[in-house]
């Protein structure tokens, strides 16, 4: 059983949803980013999505675009992102880490080298936003062969004809993007999310995590009553942007994570 399967199974047995947190690797700098990464589990993160900075993050809103820029300006590379995961794994062998980003940097790095090093570093899953199922052979197939889950995005515009193709080779969990558009956009209504999850459950037994537009503990709790996972990214990244120092960034991100975790954990009581 993979770390992702294990974590979602444990939480299902506990009767609660997972808090899935997104931060960009290397934002606001390597050391502070590593502190955040290492601090997230104790602050209540059940699964961590770690963004791989790329110069053209087309699916991301302003907050994550700026985070990517900060990380790149601080010298973050794919090699350093994998090193961060290695350093995280020294102290934590249980919290799943999913790398999220775009195909171009992986292609340039070399797919086989990337998959080998990602597995060795302790990466559990990949979300590659610009690689559709038609291109499975390029990365999804070798990644899954190495034991790395390949997580697909589904959106309100993924219709019933397309959905089986998207979900066919998915593993780990399904990431439902509740609002069409870029990350950090407005949030969806509870009714919309309820309907969307019911539709997805007709097509897959995988855990369903819902993200995009969730910013507060109250919003997180609302989604946690419906979904297997609640994804929060832009709200955490905004804390880094607003911080006056790297130390403040670490403190503020982990404080918000704790508040979100309280919302998620109390949602079904």
Swiss-Prot record:
Its EC number is 4.2.1.20. The active site is at residues 49, 60. Gene3D superfamilies: Aldolase class I. SUPFAM superfamilies: Ribulose-phoshate binding barrel (SSF51366). Pathway: Amino-acid biosynthesis; L-tryptophan biosynthesis; L-tryptophan from chorismate: step 5/5. The alpha subunit is responsible for the aldol cleavage of indoleglycerol phosphate to indole and glyceraldehyde 3-phosphate. Tetramer of two alpha and two beta chains. This is Tryptophan synthase alpha chain. It comes from Pseudomonas putida (strain ATCC 47054 / DSM 6125 / CFBP 8728 / NCIMB 11950 / KT2440).
